[in-house]
Amino acid sequence: MNTVRVTFLLVFVLAVSLGQADKDENRMEMQEKTEQGKSYLDFAENLLLQKLEELEAKPLEEDSEESRNSRQKRCIGEGVPCDENDPRCCSGLVCLKPTLHGIWYKSYYCYKK
């Protein structure tokens, strides 16, 4: 019975001592992985920041380009004389001859469609 106890005690001591060594090793590995993880996180954060800056800059460029190119030229409002050959009526208006009889300064005016 003593041999069983001694054997059990010996196995127990070996397991504890080897377990402690593994625990220290695991702790060191975890620290290394944590440091590597931080560097990966920093790299990923910088990459994400660059992408975000690119995305933020893109709409601003598009907006400024649109505002330069899509600006509507001055147009003529409703009931204002217009030129038959070069109508500059605002959107939704058409350059037409007036339907009423009378003396008009010009023969064409901007009317709603």
From Swiss-Prot:
Residues 22-74 form a propeptide. Residues 1-21 form the signal peptide. Its main location: secreted. It is found in: Secreted. Keywords: Disulfide bond, Ion channel impairing toxin, Knottin, Secreted, Signal, Toxin. Residues 57-69 have a biased composition (Basic and acidic residues). The keyword Cell inner membrane does not apply. One of its GO terms (cellular component) is extracellular region. Expressed by the venom gland. Residues 57-83 are annotated as: Disordered. Probable ion channel inhibitor. This is U11-theraphotoxin-Hhn1a. It comes from Cyriopagopus hainanus (Chinese bird spider).
